[in-house]
Amino acid sequence: MTKKRHLFTSESVTEGHPDKICDQISDSILDAILSKDANARVACETTVTTGLVLVAGEITTSTYVDIPKIVRETIQGIGYTRAKYGFDAETCAVLTSIDEQSADIAMGVDQALEAREGQMTDAEIEAIGAGDQGLMFGFACNETQELMPLPISLAHKLARRLTEVRKNDTLSYLRPDGKTQVTVEYDENGKPVRVDTIVISTQHHPDVTWEEIDRDLKEHVIKAVVPAELIDGETKFFINPTGRFVIGGPQGDAGLTGRKIIVDTYGGYARHGGGAFSGKDATKVDRSAAYAARYVAKNIVAAGLAEKAEVQLAYAIGVAQPVSISVDTFGTGKVSEDVLVELVRNNFDLRPAGIIKMLDLRRPIYKQTAAYGHFGRTDVDLSWERTDKAVALKEQAGL
């Protein structure tokens, strides 16, 4: 059966989107705790609405952090600094409801040995079980330099640029909330050939005209980000297609941590296990194993063993070894998928404590991942984006 040309779409959102405000608050609290207590257990959820922030969850730590202060600093950094936005850092109410981690969960994860970070023997790593059951996916492909699908890569770059031109006053009438969406056309061989559609919706000052926004975003955002060779006379642009976007942020929509899991990962191009990332420390495999799966997939593609690779990991609560590891190369593999699974087992320690050690995940590195994607980032140094295993994988595969 011959393949046909087809379209694929992914979206991103700016850091001022209500759900992303929540992700950033949750990860800012996580970072503040990890900077003082590397072995803390954190599961921190945030919700925002007009004039209100609620932080809830389970935190077990030997340190203290000023949660309302962190919340206000995060909101201020995003740009909600005026009461007329319907939400601002100084006047919003901040409520907290924090408990300790359940003793039943801790029993499956805790070991006194865990405090000896970096000194754990294999037996000690084996003794630390996963904090929950679940399945996680990681993906990589050779469509972009960062080995990510092109639609989500462009959508993130547009969203980041939208924030840049707001914060550097190139377009001072912009306000923090915004969304981007990119549709890419793929040829018969599954290669991206052109951008078919770009959608940008951005919050703005009430006095600016739609014509001005349309002109400025094409000039200062789209042209600055999307390679000219991907845009042609047939490319469609929808800039603020409703015509007006003044009420936004938490005044326009309530926000919640963990509600942008597709934006956070691969834009729908790969499968997703359902677990969110933000506000969770690295003993939560929802986060750490998804990072490890990306690390594995990226190294497989970087090694030239496949053009595309999707890795699935699965865990049982309290058990260290993954209950399953699978690799799908969508017919692009240079070696069989059975061989790839064996290479993965031999080169990556995918037990929870092994992942933490391998990727050095007990550091306060998470707030920077809470907007514009956790994968394919070229603006920050993330351990799971390294391709340091590629040479060994290629050699062991005999290529």
From Swiss-Prot:
Cell compartment(s), UniProt: Cytoplasm
Binding-site positions, K(+): 45
GO CC entries: cytoplasm
Major location category of this protein: cytoplasm
Biological processes per GO annotation: one-carbon metabolic process; S-adenosylmethionine biosynthetic process
Gene giving rise to this polypeptide: metK
InterPro entries assigned: ADOMET_SYNTHASE_CS (IPR022631), S-AdoMet_synt_C (IPR022630), S-AdoMet_synt_central (IPR022629), S-AdoMet_synt_N (IPR022628), S-AdoMet_synthetase (IPR002133), S-AdoMet_synthetase_sfam (IPR022636)
Top EC class for this record: transferase
Spans annotated as Flexible loop: 101-111
EC number of the protein: 2.5.1.6
Protein name per Swiss-Prot or TrEMBL: S-adenosylmethionine synthase
Binding site for L-methionine: 58, 101, 253, 284
UniProt xrefs under Pfam families: S-AdoMet_synt_C, S-AdoMet_synt_M, S-AdoMet_synt_N
Database matches in HAMAP family: S_AdoMet_synth1
UniProt pathway annotation: Amino-acid biosynthesis; S-adenosyl-L-methionine biosynthesis; S-adenosyl-L-methionine from L-methionine: step 1/1
Record flagged with keyword Nucleotide-binding: yes
Described purpose of this protein according to its UniProt entry: Catalyzes the formation of S-adenosylmethionine (AdoMet) from methionine and ATP. The overall synthetic reaction is composed of two sequential steps, AdoMet formation and the subsequent tripolyphosphate hydrolysis which occurs prior to release of AdoMet from the enzyme.
Catalytic function, reaction form: L-methionine + ATP + H2O = S-adenosyl-L-methionine + phosphate + diphosphate
Cofactor: Mg(2+); K(+)
Family to which this protein belongs: Belongs to the AdoMet synthase family.
Gene3D superfamilies tied to this protein: 3.30.300.10
Binding sites annotated in the UniProt record for ATP: 17, 177-179, 244-245, 253, 259-260, 276, 280
